[in-house]
Structures are given as C-alpha cells and as structure tokens.
C-alpha cells in the first residue's frame, strides 16, 4: 500500500506526504542506512528522538545474515529489529554489482560466491522479491543491474550502458510480476538506469512508466563518476519523473547533494555518508565540515555547532569529542553519529518548511553561504 500526496511545489522542489503500511512520511526525507537491520551506533529509540521517519535495510546482507528463515520467524524485519516505523529495502542489485570478479551476470540473474563463506548463491528478480516479501518492508525495490561508470578502467560506452539498462527493464517486469504473484501488500519502486547517457535514461523511464510502479528511483549515480556528470544526469532525469509518484535518488550523498536533489524534484534519499563519516570523525555542520581528530580541537570548548539541537551539541565540547575519537571510545562514534544524522534530518525539515513557505531559492542561497563560512 502506498499513497503519495503532493502538498506544495516551489520550482521543481516538492513537499509531499507518503503513506505506507507502517506510517506517514513527510517528504523530502533522508533515510538512515541500517544495512544489517541496525543503523550503526544508533538504537531505534535514538532514531525516533532525532525524527527518523523511515530507515533502509539491505536485502543482500540480511539474506546472508541472519537469513530469511530467521527473519520469517519474527514476521518480518520490523519485529526482528524492534522498529515500528517504515522501512525501505534495496533489492541487492547494487551489492552484487559491488562484488566485481566474484559474480557472473546472466539474463536469468546473478550467480556469485558468498563473501562470508564462499557458498555458491543465485539472486534474480524473483528471489529478490521473495526475500523482500519475508522482510515485509514497506517499500520494496525492483531487482536491477547497477550500470557501472567504468568498465575495464574506462567509462562505459553507450552500447554497454544500453545493454545493462535494457536488462534492468526486463528484470523490472519480472520483479513486478513476482511481487504481484506473492500478493505483497507493500509498495514497489522501479529504478531508472542508463549510465551517463540522457537518451538511455529517457528510454529507461519510459519503460518503467509502462510497467506502472508505485514510485520511481534514480539508480546508477554516485558510482565513481565525476560530480558534474552526476549533476547533469540528475538535472535531466529529476524533473522528468512522473509528478504523481514519489522520486528516490539512491545512495546520494553530501548535504550539497541533498539540496541539489530536492531542487531537481527528488523526495527521498539514502546514503551511508553521515554514519560512516561519523565513525571516522568527519562531522557535518551548518557551517561546514569538522574533522574532529585534528589537534586544533583538543582544547576547543565550543559545541560542534551552536545552532544544532542534537544531544551531542547540547552537552559536549569539541575537545571532548576530539578526546573520545583519539582514544577510540565507542561513545565517540555514537555521539558523532547522533550529530550527523540529526544534521541531515534537520536539513530535510528545513527544506520541507522552505518549500511550504515558497522560499526554497532563498533557503538554497543561505545554505551555501553558511556552509562556505567554515566551522
């Protein structure tokens, strides 16, 4: 089940409301990544406290560990991980793409060796839909082939990107057929592929519109291409996505990427960047980024960001966070993660308000000025 209501627009930016089986999601929204059914360093309670409305789980990794049989005993991923709000699961396509030499792609699906124990495994549109049915995620992604930016050390040609994209379209049809056969009560999104080629992206989108998914995602970006190529494709595809459906930009990215995405009609984002960077001591703030391990912070009494209302900024100094990071204390990773995710989710809230009030362009201008100021 999925209902998408468009509440306001400001240029191409959209303010909406997405209703799925486990609740209502205010868009545009950022989805923290919980690869193994856990957002690293965060409890479900802490996620709710920073206003996370939906999280992402990883079909491929959850299939390998703990396995579908375990999750099935709990009635799905929500019950298994103790999270009662919406969940989106990716299809496993990107993870299989990331295996490189360990996998073989055929029309039927992908044969690969488990990165855990070397077992021979097979993932196809049908298998991906079956796994996601057991996970009972609110939003299911079609199984696709993520077109690589580079093949054999050079950018993929139009012919290579076309071949990959057309197979993803055939897999899209098989995905929705299996989704319907299983009478899955949740929502299914299609994925626009086509590499760096606008005409292939158009062909992919047209094919997905014929299949009629509940929502549509842009895949195959942030896979090693130059930033200008990513923006070119985003600016071409984003405004062409169907107005009555939610738009999801997969695996992207920096705060600047989120603002650029919203400006081009994107409603949903996910990325490991705020959580992974937090564990590495890279913190995002309204006024630029902070690398907390730098010695300049060892006696800095200021909070990370005086304008931030997160638990870390309300209670601790940069000096203390520097100390925790240098000593490898687990609390450091936790506080850093709370801060980064709070910053990302607060940025989305500010964009929702700006779109509702018809001042999104002013917001973008102020956002860039603040970020350039330096923390």
Swiss-Prot record:
Domain of life, per UniProt, equals Bacteria
Which residues hold Zn(2+)?
308, 310, 313, 339
Q: Which residues form the active site?
A: 90 (proton acceptor), 270 (nucleophile)
Pfam families with a match to the protein in the record: TGT
Q: What is its EC number?
A: 2.4.2.29
UniProt pathway annotation? tRNA modification; tRNA-queuosine biosynthesis
Q: How is the cofactor bound?
A: Binds 1 zinc ion per subunit.
Q: Which cofactor does it need?
A: Zn(2+)
Q: Does the keyword Nucleotide-binding apply?
A: no
Its keywords, alphabetically, are: Glycosyltransferase, Metal-binding, Queuosine biosynthesis, Transferase, tRNA processing, Zinc
GO molecular-function annotation terms? metal ion binding; tRNA-guanosine(34) queuine transglycosylase activity
Q: Which reaction does it catalyse?
A: 7-aminomethyl-7-carbaguanine + guanosine(34) in tRNA = 7-aminomethyl-7-carbaguanosine(34) in tRNA + guanine
Region called RNA binding, residue ranges: 251-257, 275-279
What's a GO cellular component annotated to this UniProt protein? cytosol
One GO biological process term is: tRNA-guanine transglycosylation
Q: According to its UniProt record, which protein family does this protein belong to?
A: Belongs to the queuine tRNA-ribosyltransferase family.
| HAMAP family associated with the record | Q_tRNA_Tgt (MF_00168)
Q: So what does this one do?
A: Catalyzes the base-exchange of a guanine (G) residue with the queuine precursor 7-aminomethyl-7-deazaguanine (PreQ1) at position 34 (anticodon wobble position) in tRNAs with GU(N) anticodons (tRNA-Asp, -Asn, -His and -Tyr). Catalysis occurs through a double-displacement mechanism. The nucleophile active site attacks the C1' of nucleotide 34 to detach the guanine base from the RNA, forming a covalent enzyme-RNA intermediate. The proton acceptor active site deprotonates the incoming PreQ1, allowing a nucleophilic attack on the C1' of the ribose to form the product.
User: What is this protein identified as?
Assistant: Queuine tRNA-ribosyltransferase
């Amino acid at each position: 089940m999925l209902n998408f209501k468009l509440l306001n627009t400001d240029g191409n930016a959209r303010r909406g409301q997405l209703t799925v089986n486990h609740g209502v999601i205010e868009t545009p929204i950022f989805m923290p990544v919980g690869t193994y059914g856990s957002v690293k360093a965060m409890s479900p309670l802490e996620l709710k406290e920073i206003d996370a409305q939906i999280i992402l789980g990883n079909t491929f990794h959850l299939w390998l560990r703990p396995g579908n049989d375990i999750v099935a005993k709990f009635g799905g991923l929500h019950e298994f991980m103790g999270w009662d709000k919406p969940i989106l699961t990716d299809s496993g396509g990107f993870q299989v793409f990331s295996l490189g030499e360990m996998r073989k792609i055929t029309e039927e699906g992908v044969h690969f060796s488990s990165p855990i124990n070397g077992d021979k495994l097979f993932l196809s549109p049908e298998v991906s839909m079956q796994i996601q049915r057991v996970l009972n995620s609110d939003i299911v992604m079609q199984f696709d082939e993520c077109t690589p930016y580079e093949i054999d050390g050079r950018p993929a040609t139009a012919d290579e990107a076309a071949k990959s994209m057309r197979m993803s379209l055939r897999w899209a049809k098989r995905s929705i057929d299996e989704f319907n056969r299983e009478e899955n009560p949740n929502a299914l999104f299609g994925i626009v592929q086509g590499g760096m080629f606008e005409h292939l992206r158009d062909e992919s989108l047209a094919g997905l519109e014929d299949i009629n998914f509940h929502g549509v995602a842009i895949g195959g970006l942030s896979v090693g291409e130059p930033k200008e190529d990513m923006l070119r494709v985003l600016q071409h595809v984003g405004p062409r996505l169907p107005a009555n459906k939610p738009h999801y930009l997969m695996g992207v990215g920096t705060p600047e990427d989120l603002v650029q995405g919203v400006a081009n009609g994107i409603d949903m984002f996910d990325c490991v960047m705020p959580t992974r960077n937090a564990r590495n001591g890279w913190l995002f703030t309204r006024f630029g980024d902070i690398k907390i391990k730098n010695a300049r912070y060892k006696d800095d009494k200021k909070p990370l960001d005086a304008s931030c209302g997160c638990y870390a900024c309300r209670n601790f100094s940069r000096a203390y966070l520097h100390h925790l990071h240098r000593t490898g204390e687990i609390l450091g990773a936790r506080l850093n993660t709370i801060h980064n995710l709070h910053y990302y989710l607060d940025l989305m809230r500010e964009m929702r308000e700006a779109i509702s009030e018809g001042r999104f362009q002013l917001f973008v201008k102020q956002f860039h000025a603040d970020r350039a100021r330096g923390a």
